[in-house]
Amino acid sequence: MGIKGLTKFIADTAPNAIKEIKIENLMGRVVAIDASMSLYQFIIAIRDGDQYGNLMNESGETTSHISGLMSRTIKLMENGLKPIYVFDGAPPELKGSELEKRGEKRQKAEELLIKAKEEGNLEEIKKQSGRTVRVTKKQNEEAKKLLTLMGIPVIESPCEAEAQCAFLTKYEMAHATATEDADALVFGTKILIRNLNANASSNKNKNKNSSKRGYILTEINLEQVLKGLKLTMDEFIDFCILCGCDYCDTIKGIGSKTAYNLIKEYNCIENIIKNIDQNKYQVPANFKYVEARQSFIKPKVLEKSEVKIDWCEPKIEELKKFLIKEHNFNEVRVTNYITRLLKARKVTTQRRLDTFFTTCTKKSTKLIIEENQKEVLKTKSKGKKREINNDNSTKLNAKKKKTNVKDEKKNNEKVDEPKNKPNENLVKDEDDQDDYDQNIFDERTNSESGNIKNENVKEDISSSDITMDIPKCINDIVC
């Protein structure tokens, strides 16, 4: 379930924290993906025929999760992402009552699905089919095997996958968490990516507008959320518990807006309980908000030293055997997927320019480029001055020689007249007006982008000069 109404509340109250991005914006980024959520989406989305049944092999076993996972992973890699899949471990004890409720809802949906099939109600069949889906242990193991054979890193969380994903961003081992569960923000993920598998469905179920707009994702920035809501992380956690989470019941009569106002006034749940009118707001008898809070602050996750992220070469022959022989995939289709996989691996090895600079130095990319360009200008300025001085000397000698010839003629005609002195004003070269001022770079440069504004200055600095000097700058600052 995640946090009830959280995304909408953030969109309304802290709109700067949410933005739409294209998948290209994540090129070169490591993204920690909630594997269980992805498998659930694939099983729901990829259907066969009008009865909305899962894709199956000859043995009657579901293969929608395998087909979707393989296709989507390759697509992400083709767009330059480096996916890490994180699988759920044992569910926390606090989640027991929530899981029971989900089981009851699933059972009811199965009954409604049987009735819809008897009546031939296709719309109801589609609706209830999605509600009956659950990812089995066997499907999880098959997904892990597939990813391992593809050479994709797999991490098994001791508990909640989204919590482990969030901590990977805290460890700076991943850029973002990809899941539909907003509680990843409460676990502290720096960036939350939603809709990563939005286009995972078959052609029949695809959104026709998605291809026109491109592959659009939703990005939520936790730092901007806290800034926009003007809450500390501890206050944000208590706010989310009051909104409604998987770990405990909540106070009846309190929605997201009321919860936010109460947190702003009283700062924490303890103070809220002391001050609210309990006739108006019914506090649960066994309100385990303290345990829920601790589950968000200190969830069961692997420590940084325990996390092993291995990018391996695909095991092609084993992958073919797994797909073709064990799950009856079409051989031509599998060959096509493997060809795409091998090509996509080359794309994921490309590094982002900004991450390269970040790992080298704490200076910003803009500052490094500006400093490097100034060094180029300084060198060129010195060279230009030398040329001007040499040119001046040559012209001075020529003028002196010319003057001496004139003087000699005059001396021959008028011996009594003194020799003429060369006019110093004639020696001054009009090219001196173009002597380069080193400070001109700062005046003629766009401080935001580092691009040179003045075309004349731009002619003095060729793009090849700058690109040749930047690697030297990089080498100088690498630790």
Curated annotation (Swiss-Prot):
Transmembrane feature ranges: none
Annotated region (Interaction with PCNA), positions in chain: 349-357
DNA repair in keyword set: yes
Biased composition (Basic and acidic residues): 404-428
Its EC number(s): 3.1.-.-
Subunit structure: Interacts with PCNA. Three molecules of FEN1 bind to one PCNA trimer with each molecule binding to one PCNA monomer. PCNA stimulates the nuclease activity without altering cleavage specificity.
Protein name: Flap endonuclease 1
Gene for this chain: FEN1
